[in-house]
Regions:
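Chalcogenol-based redox active-site neighborhoods
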Residues: 1-158
Length: 158
């Protein structure tokens, strides 16, 4: 998928500062000590698989919230595109714009020759360590959507 290093379970999660669809900037560090963070990298807004994936995550949102976890979708799309995308598919959790590709690179999921990230999920605990991760090798396959049930199981064990 990439030539960058993907942070492993147990390692510190890279911080980020990304603009949400509402124009607000979000950082990982502002949640440390308070909430777990689930980062769901998706290739592109309005693409067929992403349009299927994110509503599934929206349906699971109450379970993540009950586990004291904030959820963010992350793509290289502009925050305006993410706002329109969120409205069109009924997603209420923040979709963050990685316009400069810095977060995608830091998490090792940027596909340089395509200019967007692969499909990947990282669960970061309250101490800022990666508790669980799943990387999809095929960004265009619905079967390769990361198993978020596994993320919930990792939270239950933590």
């Amino acid at each position: 998928m990439q030539t960058m290093t993907i942070p492993d379970v147990g390692q510190a999660a890279p911080d980020f500062r990304l603009r949400g669809a509402d124009g607000t900037f979000y950082t990982l560090s502002e949640y440390l000590g308070d909430q777990n963070v689930l980062l769901v990298f998706y290739p592109l807004a309005f693409s067929p698989v992403c349009t299927h994936q994110l509503p599934e995550l929206q349906a699971m949102l109450p379970r993540f919230e009950a586990a004291d976890t904030v959820v963010f979708g992350v793509s290289v799309d502009s925050h305006w595109s993410n706002a329109a995308f969120a409205r069109s598919i009924g997603v209420r959790f923040p979709l963050l714009s990685d316009w400069k590709r810095e977060a995608s690179a830091a998490y090792g999921v940027l596909i340089p020759d395509k200019g967007y990230s692969g499909r990947a999920s990282f669960l970061v605990d309250k101490q800022g360590r990666i508790l669980w991760r799943e990387i999809s090798e095929n960004t265009g396959s619905i079967e390769e959507i990361p198993s978020l049930e596994a993320a919930l199981a990792a939270l239950a064990k933590a």
